[in-house]
């Protein structure tokens, strides 16, 4: 009997014997969906439709790449700033200004990405 929840047939029959979740759980949404449709093309429903969906998600991922990179850079910078909590003790006003700037940048980048998806 096929386990349609944990191992759906349209994924386990694919030539690569690779279930999308093995890769997708680590991928950004649009890239993950692109890969999902490529892996299952021809095994569930209309193959051409899956390829078109993959192409569409690839285009969206490409459009969002710059915003995503900026978001990740800002997020990484924010984490570094949090790691330097000693600045909070020595220069609290500067720390708070930096924090406001970084959080504001992340919120703007996230809003842009969400609006495009």
What are these regions (language model features)?
Residues 1-117:
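Intrinsically disordered, low-complexity regulatory regions
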């Amino acid at each position: 009997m096929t386990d349609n929840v944990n191992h759906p047939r349209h994924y386990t029959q694919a030539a690569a014997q690779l279930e999308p979740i093995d890769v997708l759980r680590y991928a950004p949404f649009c890239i993950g969906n692109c890969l999902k449709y490529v892996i299952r093309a021809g095994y569930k429903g209309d193959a051409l439709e899956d390829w078109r969906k993959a192409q569409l998600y690839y285009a969206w991922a490409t459009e969002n790449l710059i915003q995503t990179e900026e978001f990740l850079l800002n997020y990484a910078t924010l984490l570094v700033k949090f790691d330097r909590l000693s600045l909070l003790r020595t220069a609290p006003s500067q720390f708070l200004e930096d924090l406001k700037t970084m959080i504001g940048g992340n919120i703007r980048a996230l809003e842009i990405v969400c609006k495009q998806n």
